[in-house]
Amino acid sequence: MGRFIFVSFSLLVVFLSLSGTGAHCPSGWYTYEGHCYRVFQQNMTWEDAEKFCTQQYEKSHLVSFRSSEEVDFLVSLLKVDLFWMGRRDIWNERRLQWSDGTKVDYKDWRAKPECIVCRATDNHWLSTSCSETHNVICKFET
């Protein structure tokens, strides 16, 4: 009985000590500030990359950033130059109005949707066509 209590207590101590070290992220994922990240060196379009991320883990999406420290953390993991971010600018979803204040009901845009990549070498964000292919970083909140 005493041995069982000792083993149970030991396992509890190990579990509690691992709870802040990324043990809550799936295997192959990195942890930072309550989020899990995984770098995939696979070139995909933005739409395919976002779909791919949602298939990797139920709450996962393309990476988004909340701070420069978060970007620095990810760049330290990378062996890729350009990767998709979870932000895109779709012309047809903009809330536009005419100079007289009326709503824009008619749209005849020639521009294609623009998506955002991050260049890891200098942390700059670049607007590019969503049909280009780039590497993928998925992220979800723990």
Swiss-Prot record:
Pfam families the record matches: Lectin_C
Signal peptide: 1-23
Family: Belongs to the snaclec family.
Organism: Sistrurus catenatus edwardsii (Desert massasauga)
Sites where a glycan is attached: 43
Quaternary structure and interacting proteins, as annotated: Heterodimer; disulfide-linked.
Residue ranges of domain C-type lectin in the record: 32-139
Intrachain S-S bonds: 25-36, 53-138, 115-130
InterPro entries: C-type_lectin-like, C-type_lectin-like/link_sf, C-type_lectin/snaclec_domain, C-type_lectin_CS, CTDL_fold
Keyword Glycoprotein carried by entry: yes
Location in the cell: Secreted
The protein's name: Snaclec 2
GO cellular component: extracellular region
Entry annotated with the keyword Glycosyltransferase: no
